Amino acid sequence: MLNDAKQTRANPGTSRPHSNGGGSSHGNELPRRTEQRAQGPRQPARLPKQGKTNGKSDGNITAGETQRGGIPRGKGPRGGKTNTRRTPPKAGAQPQPSNNRK
């Protein structure tokens, strides 16, 4: 009986910090993953449109090739977006020395 009570107390105690810690880490990763997923479908959506303009009959064959080429291209812009995010903090650091001069 006493052993059962101790186990029940230990279980919720361990589950609470574990769930909170895991949830916080996953919460940070999820938004990053969603951003990458959003970028993927946007680019292929533009490529099929180009393939249709080239030729509807042969568009099916060319569309597959254009989509494959578009996927590696999508990886390049992702790096550029990360650079843009890094730039704003740099701009914020510039006014700080000016305040010190004052």
From Swiss-Prot:
Residues 8-17, 51-65 have a biased composition (Polar residues). It comes from the Viruses. Residues 1-102 are annotated as: Disordered. Residues 75-88 have a biased composition (Basic residues). Not known. Encoded on a subgenomic RNA (RNA3) synthesized during replication and which is co-terminal with RNA1. This is Protein B1. It comes from Black beetle virus. The lineage of its organism: Viruses, Riboviria, Orthornavirae, Kitrinoviricota, Magsaviricetes. The gene is B1.
